[in-house]
């Protein structure tokens, strides 16, 4: 189980100040992150180190990350709100 301290920290790191990112990342960290395996948790934390403008392009599907694993996490987050 994910510790409350870790979830709170990730919650605040997921709040990017850009509404388009906040509406995707904040619910994901609250509802999905606790159920991810360790590899995907690490991947989500790595995603949070990316620049907001890069993430915006990926989530708006204007571009794809050159990192296939990061793109997989982007897809996982998008599939939560718009299943294919």
Curated annotation (Swiss-Prot):
Identify the main location. Answer: cytoplasm
Q: Which domain of life, per UniProt?
A: Bacteria
Location relative to the cell: Cytoplasm
**Record's keyword annotation contains Zinc:** no
**Annotated organism of origin:** Pseudomonas syringae pv. syringae (strain B728a)
Q: What is this protein called?
A: FAD assembly factor SdhE
Which family does the similarity line name? Answer: Belongs to the SdhE FAD assembly factor family.
GO biological process annotation, one example: succinate metabolic process
Keyword Chaperone: yes or no? yes
- Record Gene3D superfamilies: Flavinator of succinate dehydrogenase
* Listed GO CC annotations: cytoplasm
Primary role: An FAD assembly protein, which accelerates covalent attachment of the cofactor into other proteins. Plays an essential role in the assembly of succinate dehydrogenase (SDH, respiratory complex II), an enzyme complex that is a component of both the tricarboxylic acid cycle and the electron transport chain, and which couples the oxidation of succinate to fumarate with the reduction of ubiquinone (coenzyme Q) to ubiquinol. Required for flavinylation (covalent attachment of FAD) of the flavoprotein subunit SdhA of SDH and other flavinylated proteins as well.
Alphabetized, the UniProt keywords read: Chaperone, Cytoplasm
């Amino acid at each position: 189980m994910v510790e409350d301290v870790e979830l709170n920290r990730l919650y605040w790191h997921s709040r990017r100040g850009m509404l388009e990112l906040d509406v995707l990342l904040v619910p994901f960290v609250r509802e999905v992150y606790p159920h991810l395996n360790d590899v995907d948790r690490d991947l989500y934390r790595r995603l949070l180190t990316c620049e907001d403008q890069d993430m915006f392009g990926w989530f708006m599907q204007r571009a794809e990350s050159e990192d296939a694993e990061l793109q997989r996490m982007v897809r996982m987050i998008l599939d939560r709100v718009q299943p294919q």
